[in-house]
Amino acid sequence: MDAATPGNGIISDVVFVIEGTANLGPYFESLRKHYLLPAIEYFNGGPPAETDFGGDYGGTQYSLVVFNTVDCAPESYVQCHAPTSSAYEFVQWLDSIKFMGGGGESCSLIAEGLSTALQLFDDFKKMREQIGQTHKVCILICNSPPYLLPAVESTTYSGYTTENLVQKIGERGIHFSIISPRKLPALRTLFEKAMPVGLIEPQPKDYSQDPRHMILVRGMVLPVGGATSVPGVMPPKQHISQPPLPVVPPQIASAPSHQLPPVQPPYMQVPQQSTLTPAHAAAHSAVEAAKNQKNSPSNRFLLPNLNPMPNAPAVGTPFNQPPAPTLPPNASVPKMVPSPSSLMTPASQSSLITTVTTGPGPAPVQLQQQGAPQQPVPPSMPITGAVGGVQAPQPSQPQIGTVQLPCTQTPVNGNKLLAWSGVLEWQEKPRSVSVDNNAKLTRSLPCQVYINPGENLKTDQWPQKLIMQLIPQQLLTTLGPLFRNSRMVQFHFTNKDLESLKGLYRIMGSGFAGCVHFPHTTPCEVRVLMLLYSSKKKIFMGLIPNDQSGFVNGIRQVITNHKQVQMQKIDQQRNMGAVQGVGAGSVPANSQGFLQKQPGTLPVGQAVSQQMQGQQVAPGMPSISQVAMMDEQQRSQNLLHIRVQQPQQLASQAPPQATQSSVQAPGQPQNPQPGAMLRPQNPGANPQLRNLLLSQQPPQSSVPQTQQPLHHMQQAAQSMLPHQAMGQQMQHQAPGQLQLPGQSLMHQTPAQQWGNQMQQRAPIPGTLMMSAGPRGPVPQSGLQQVQAQSVMEDDILMDLI
């Protein structure tokens, strides 16, 4: 087959014809490594070196032709490099090829490339006139069949089809070879038609390093294909025999950290083998499994878990029965059952992180499935017994979880550099229902920060402990540009505290991000670091924004906007609750803070107790339609803007009495509204005073709305003490109202109970309180309301500021 070898001293003319489209791009690196570089070494007599030159005419000449498809117009169909005698320079030409275009084409312009190659051989013939006969080789590297079109760009061979050109190549004694990542019948036909005249070829050798490659060679020698001759690839027998060796029971009984790691290297190498078919591999695995079952009686409880295909759906059923108490309350059992497709890929090893965080129970099953994914098992064997046999010993479960996390995270950090090591601390709400809502549970985990090689991150000034605060990821959607302009590091956590690690996975996987704030006392360039969890890659990534000040301001603005939205939602819920109260048969609630307007008297303590019992309508109350009409009449006359002088005018017309909204008929209880002023009633109230007050309302005052409530309070404070009796109830101020100087604040927070807070007490001398004297209603719209803020957001905002 090979007419010349490097030791014979025969000079060669070599032309590489390569398809320069994106169809070949993904495969070119593999073809270059396994076939092109060995071919160059064959013609060069050794590896290419920068100082190797065979002379302009005396040594081996290399030339490169790159052809495309018809979609490359208006560019030329072919790019040609002039011949060179330097193998090193030729390799640089190969590395500079840009594989692009051809995505919408199923064929390529092979005829254009071969016609240009024939022109190059014509030029070689003129250059070699003084040397004589040379060894001529044309190598075609492509991944698509040829167009049924003749060559058009070549001047000498214009009009020749691809078959005509390969026949021309064979007639001129040029050895034609084809290297393709796919077995294409059209290319094999070209190889057969390019056979030199009068040459009887022996049985071709198999040079393919991958069973999918088609390697048809003439005129040169390549390394023989197969897994045994490729450096770094283990023989097939070692691939098949190693996966069944690690078994879970020895790991549980002994040290699991020494048994589990050998599973991964042979499993990662299984896709590299190319000589055994899947059927042979499965048969060999079945034989090995039978031997292990015979030698180790304890394995019979675990062998049913080795078949991921037919029994995978049945594995999920026992998980909900006996091992359920070992899972966290929010564990998602379906996540523990991997799909058959994920078990057959090496990338599925990283999915063990999710399995450990959701619960350590089913972990041995997944380990066995990954260790030997091709071992068949009779369907009649009980799956439930297998799972129960593995999970019965409770002390063994933390050991299995302890083994899995480092093994799954170690490959991620294999090519990264350790930049910082310390402790990460955060707070989360306890999962117990009986615990106070404001209670916080502090957790911490040892962690390491890794960076990519070549990155420069100064961590020598970082504190030993990083404090992380949780923030919902939905609040960070507006900070996308700041996230994109950031550096990325990787966090790796040590699983010394398995409970804290599971809690971190649970929180970060449920829509929260970690805001790591560096204190100002630390002399480092980083102030804020965002910790995010990638559920797709199963890793924790840290984003360090380049614009630190802009990022801090952005988070501050996001939190401010979020609080404003929350306040608006709370106000809307209050209004909706008032409307729903009317529809349910309760006394209509005035959303603007008015007092109730039904005539009658009722002690304050009884009114408060009725209010806390759901605001039920008492016997003898007016109908809902009448109350609604009174509400509408009050709104129409704008009682929010009563002048300061109104109480004085009313005092001249009627004796001291209760306000218009609190006058009720005898025997009719009052149902106060939350946020209204509660005060004792005047026994001498006139039932017909309401109509008098509504008919004599003066026009709107020019006093600003925001100042009117204060005028009312000042006017009432001047005449409070003479009207307040020893047995009267002290007044209640609505939540959220401002407190006057010297005024005692008597309101309750929403989280407190009213039960024992309404005892009667004597007035405190020197203290100004809201009296029961005649005055207008006290509106709430002009008073400032302060909404309680969540503890988590306050902590974040305080630390960021």
Curated annotation (Swiss-Prot):
Chief location of this protein within or outside the cell: nucleus
Sequence motif: LXXLL motif, positions: 689-693
- Any Pfam family hit: Med25_VWA
Q: Where in the cell is it found?
A: Nucleus
Which keywords does this Swiss-Prot/TrEMBL entry list? Answer: Activator, Nucleus, Transcription, Transcription regulation
Query: Example GO biological process term?
Result: positive regulation of transcription by RNA polymerase II
Recorded hits in InterPro entries, A to Z, give: Med25_PTOV (IPR021394), Med25_PTOV_sf (IPR038196), Mediator_Med25_SD1 (IPR021397), Mediator_Med25_VWA (IPR021419), VWF_A (IPR002035), vWFA_dom_sf (IPR036465)
* Disordered: region residues: 647-735
Q: Where is the composition biased (Low complexity)?
A: 647-676, 687-710, 722-735
Q: Quick one: a GO cellular component term?
A: mediator complex
- Which domain of life, per UniProt? Eukaryota
What is annotated about its quaternary structure and interactions?
Answer: Component of the Mediator complex.
UniProt record similarity statement = Belongs to the Mediator complex subunit 25 family.
What this chain does, per the record? Component of the Mediator complex, a coactivator involved in the regulated transcription of nearly all RNA polymerase II-dependent genes. Mediator functions as a bridge to convey information from gene-specific regulatory proteins to the basal RNA polymerase II transcription machinery. Mediator is recruited to promoters by direct interactions with regulatory proteins and serves as a scaffold for the assembly of a functional preinitiation complex with RNA polymerase II and the general transcription factors.
Protein name as catalogued? Mediator of RNA polymerase II transcription subunit 25
The record lists the lineage as: Eukaryota, Metazoa, Chordata, Craniata, Vertebrata
